Amino acid sequence: MDLFPAIDLRNGKCVRLHQGDYGQETVYGDDPVAQALAFADAGAGWIHVVDLDAARTGVPENRDVVAAIAAAVPVPVQTGGGVRNRAAALALFDAGVERVVVGTAALADPDFVRDLAADHRVAVGLDAKAGEVATDGWLVGSGRSVLDVARSFADAGVDAFVVTDISRDGTLEGPDLVGLREVVEATPVDVIASGGVGTIADLRALAEIGVGGRRLAGVITGKAIYEGRFTVAEGVAALEIES
């Protein structure tokens, strides 16, 4: 089970939002590349990068920063935010990104995801409010449930589902263990949890989720690390102990 330290980009800086609210932003640094290197040096096996500006507008305003991170770190980079078409995805792969997360476009154009997943590593972002998948930077409800969308992509060849509980994101109040277990149970696709992690105990609880011998593939965490709740090394160790 992998730990994915998160770097959320807005105006080229490392930030975190509270419950996906662009009006509740905390800036944690103005050198995302240095932050990514620090995460990798501390033992992270992946770096998770989100372009928050692109997630809202579809314009890849931080693509150069994403490319600089991918070029600098010795571990694979997973990135999402505003990947609305094949050209945008290919630009990220060309920049050295290992896996692209597609959210809004996955619901609007499922065939785009299926075609891209045929020859690239793709994850589908399932960002939910009260069980409903949200799109366009978490601002628009889709009318579809997480389980419905997950099942619709079960045979699409995607690498993973990144499941985020928007109401918990940036709160440090703990992840939605029940909802995550339901997604693991519903499809054979790897599931990466995101949102709400605040303690080492939360990581251990996530590592204990198991259905039919399957477990979560990973967990994304940002604020807990930035706020000093635990270090990357401690997080990695917690997941290794329980896996």
Put a short name on every predicted segment:
Residues 54-59, 108, 132, 141, ...:
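Short, small-residue-enriched loops and turns at beta-alpha junctions
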Residues 11-15, 19-23, 90-93, 97-169:
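Conserved anion-binding
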Residues 28-40, 85-90, 142-152:
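Short, acidic/polar
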Residues 32, 60-67, 139-148, 173-182:
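Charged helix-capping and loop-helix junction motifs
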Residues 46-64, 104, 163-172:
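Glycine-rich, proline-tolerant flexible connector loops at the mouths of alpha/beta enzymes
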